[in-house]
Design a protein with these regions (language model features):
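N-terminal ordered "arm"
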Residues: 2-4, 14
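Extended, hydrophobic beta-loop-alpha segments that form or line the acyl/peptidyl-thioester binding
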Residues: 384-388
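His/Cys-centered metal/cofactor-coordination and adjacent catalytic loops
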Residues: 22
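Soluble acyl-CoA-dependent acyltransferase catalytic core bearing the H(X)4D motif
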Residues: 9-19, 27-31, 38-383
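Short secondary-structure boundary/capping segments within folded domains
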Residues: 1-2, 347
Length: 388
């Protein structure tokens, strides 16, 4: 299972309630949120995509000073949260977990002892926007909306039926994938032509990998930099642009200190939200944004903002819907094979502008496999609606 947990950290100043009491309160609230009453159920044999089914696990954990550092310092909380990255969720058991640390001394911008709350949530359950909304409803003071419990319990008959449906539907899904994949070829040609004509922004230039483009080891480290929105969105830019500017400066300095060349095409892969389709849990895509190293900070911020807008405009072009149409129909068996065959240890020769087979993923899987060169990155977590 590919690690994909998100960690949303919140700090509350001057909380007077004991941590254990707060944990019981939040556990009761979590039981009222439908999204937190679900888990993933695998289809036997992997013959179809997993289903969302009802799950009653409520996992709220408290961490006192003995778990991290004597005195409850914020440094100990950072170290404890970093250690959580190694303890990934199994969404087949529970797709979320809540951690409470407190009382915490010395938290940024806190005037008294505080409580740190960390929502650990599987990306299969929610993207960043959806996860933030869940956290907001979990931690708000207002009474939560009592919604209907999501249907379905996983039993032997539904499991067998789901496997049978996946097996019977395989030929149709495969044929649909081939047809849609073939339709992606003219759509791609059209996009390239419109790019050459200047109607669509061009993609970012490819960037040679640096020492940062390697698989990280098991150790994690966390630093907290608390900044106001106005600090990052200075000069009429956005928080995203301000953050990318800071990252650009940091990467440039780090590579220089390491004695490495700073690529002129230094690029960041940025997650960009898109309109949500139906009841999907993840509605985002990644775009490559040049970081413009070597330019003055004020100009760099402007250039990054312009590059981000161009990348968003390119990603929103209608041609991509036809290019990626086969993703929605690729059989689960083939998707699993592609994910298992993805090499996460060997970096590609260039980053920021993936080659044709990697960019089209499932839409061209058949032809890429035939050429023996498919190295598709794992797709976003995908599950079907509740079964039962």
């Amino acid at each position: 299972m590919i690690p994909n947990d998100q960690f949303l950290l919140y700090c509350f100043d001057g909380t007077r309630q004991p941590v254990d009491r707060l944990a019981r309160h939040l556990a009761a609230r979590a039981a009222t949120l439908p999204e937190l009453r679900t888990r993933v159920a695998e289809v036997p044999g992997g013959l179809d995509y997993p289903y969302w089914v009802r799950g009653d696990a409520v996992d709220v954990r408290t961490h006192d000073g003995g778990d991290w550092v004597a005195g409850g310092g914020v440094r100990g909380v950072r170290e404890a949260v970093a250690a959580l990255f190694a303890d990934q969720l199994d969404p087949r058991v529970a797709a979320w977990r809540l951690h409470l640390f407190g009382p915490v001394v010395g938290a940024p911008r806190c005037t008294a002892e505080g409580i740190v709350v960390v929502l650990q949530i599987s990306h299969a359950l929610a993207d960043g926007r959806r996860a933030s909304d869940i956290a907001r409803r979990l931690l708000t003071r207002q009474p939560p909306d009592i919604d209907t419990v999501l249907p379905g319990r996983w039993g032997p008959v539904p499991a067998a039926a789901a496997a049978a449906l996946g097996w019977v539907g395989f030929p149709t899904a495969l044929a649909r994938t081939v047809v849609r994949g073939a339709g992606a070829v003219p759509a791609r040609s059209e996009l390239d032509r419109r790019t050459e004509d200047g109607d669509v922004p061009p993609p970012a230039d490819p960037c040679p990998p640096t020492s940062l483009n390697t698989r990280p080891g098991p150790a994690r480290d966390i630093r907290l930099l608390v900044r106001g929105r106005a600090d990052l969105a200075a000069g009429g830019s956005t928080v995203t642009v301000g953050g990318l500017t800071a990252i650009s400066l940091a990467l440039e300095r780090l590579l220089t200190v390491r004695g490495e060349d700073v690529p002129g095409a230094l690029t960041a892969e940025v997650t960009v939200a898109r309109p949500r389709r139906g009841d999907e849990h993840n509605a985002f895509g990644n775009v490559s944004v040049p970081l413009h190293p070597g330019t003055p900070v004020s100009l760099r911020r402007s250039l990054i903002g312009r590059s981000l807008r161009a990348a968003r405009d390119r990603a929103a072009d209608p041609a991509w819907a036809r290019i990626r149409a086969a993703d929605a129909s690729v059989p689960a068996v083939l998707a699993r094979i592609g994910i298992r065959g993805f090499d996460i240890d060997t970096p590609p020769p260039v980053v920021g502008a993936p080659p044709w087979c990697r960019r089209w993923r499932a839409a061209t899987a058949i032809w890429c496999w035939a050429a023996g060169g498919w190295r598709s990155p794992p797709a976003s977590p995908r599950c079907r609606r509740p079964w039962g």
